[in-house]
Amino acid sequence: MKLAAIDVGLKRIGTAICLDGRIVMPQNAILRKNRNQAAHDVVSFLEEWEIEKLVVGLPKGGSSSEEMERRIQHFVSLLELDIPVVYQDEQGSSFEAKEMTQGQFRHKKDGKIDSIAAKIILERHLSL
């Protein structure tokens, strides 16, 4: 089964795929100009890779997690997908991504960290 994960942020959406059930690869992040454009770009990404299941990072715990959870679920509803969508705890994934890449490249706002966070989210889902 071909899987994808997204790490939904306010400015960028990190993406990762797993096509063989074993190897998870981060992909280019999607720049979020507005909700509709971002939703369209996510759907195009899923169609391009013929994804059969989407894993979405969802924050659990923390002071602002309820608001972000609501925003993420609303964003996912805009996708109008015909494939299964599951939510995976994303707590600490962005911090872990920054730790993993420390010194490898400058932490520019190009979405690399977001997509590595999506990779971590998908790896967590696969290890369940």
Swiss-Prot record:
Any one Gene Ontology cellular component term annotated for this protein: cytosol
EC number: 3.1.-.-
SUPFAM superfamilies, per the entry: Ribonuclease H-like
Gene3D superfamilies: YqgF/RNase H-like domain
Record's keyword annotation contains 4Fe-4S: no
Compartmental location: Cytoplasm
Name the record gives this protein: Putative pre-16S rRNA nuclease
